[in-house]
Amino acid sequence: LEEVQKMIDGGEAEIARDELLWLLNGCSDCLVAHRMLGELALADQDLRLARGHFGYAFEIGSKALDRAGAKGNMPYRLPANQAFFEAGKALAYCLRELGKSVLAAEVVARLLACDPSDPLGVRNMLDVPAPESAPGGPAPVDG
């Protein structure tokens, strides 16, 4: 995947796309490869294709979390988690741009449940209130 990133950085998007598709033939659940293909599609302004790749990457991560019974925080700051969050943010963007704001809000909610600190600013994408100002959210602490 590092070599593919070098190709993209060097302006060889078509070759990079072919390499990623070849990689997915052997490992269709490679979250990072789908995220990268989504980024290439987004660069080509193909929102539907980008949504497909970002959505598949997000689904891979979500299913892994569900199978693991993950509860609590999954911080973005850990490198192993970053592709999931980046794919989710890009998916929410694509969904919003395609007029699917309810689905975009569901993606944002999942990301915020995983890391409430919101390091990628997904809350701002849909004007989702911060937890402390949300109805039923934690009360502010005087101190």
Regions found by a protein language model. Name each.
Residues 4, 21, 38, 92, ...:
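Conserved small-residue packing positions in alpha-helical repeats and bundles
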Residues 7, 41, 95, 129-130:
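Residue at a conserved register position within TPR or TPR-like alpha-solenoid repeats
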Residues 13, 47-48, 101:
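TPR-repeat structural position
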Residues 30-31, 64, 101, 115-119:
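Residue-level recognition of tetratricopeptide repeat
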